[in-house]
Amino acid sequence: MKVVLVHHVNALTKEQDPQRHISELGQAQAKRLGARLKAIGFAPERILHSEAQWTTDTATVMAAAMGLAGRTAQAAYPINTGDAVAPFLAEIAEAKGDLMMCGHVDYLLRAASALVCNDEQRKVVEFKPGNGTAVCLEGAGSEWVVTFAWRQDHAPG
């Protein structure tokens, strides 16, 4: 099973847009990352995001670029800084296929650490904030590894 964790793309400031939709740059970042994941055949059964507009937009634009519109959903549990990762880990354990989560850096870092080394505080990956960085974890049960990570500044075009 694969789990791709995506730190949201560039968003507008509160002054530019109180709801903080993603910017034009963010739209390009999300399209590029979605196309890249599609090119390697990644087609998650669900694309989760938080209640924040910029994570919703990131997930929606990426899903469209992957040809997977309609597979996005707000996580049924909070996925913000400091929130428990146990509900996400339980969803992964019960999933029938691959998953993707577009979220916030603290939560994603702790989820990756919990999967790979069963310790949320032991950092196993790093995200470049706000730029659509993706990290792919592959495994099952208590055996997970990081298989790749992409940053926008590493992506072609």
Tell me what each language-model feature is.
Residues 2-83, 109, 120-122, 128-132:
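Active-site-proximal alpha-helix that buttresses catalytic centers in soluble enzyme cores
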Residues 16, 156-157:
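A short, polar/proline- and glycine-enriched secondary-structure boundary/capping micro-motif
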Residues 43, 94-95, 130, 142:
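Residue-level preference for short coil/turn positions at secondary-structure junctions
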Residues 77-96:
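Short phosphate-binding loop-to-helix
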Residues 92-102, 144-152:
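A polyampholytic, Gly/Pro-enriched intrinsically disordered region
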Residues 95-100, 105-133:
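Non-DNA-binding regulatory cores of transcription-related proteins
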Residues 119-147, 152-156:
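Domain-level recognition of soluble alpha/beta enzyme cores
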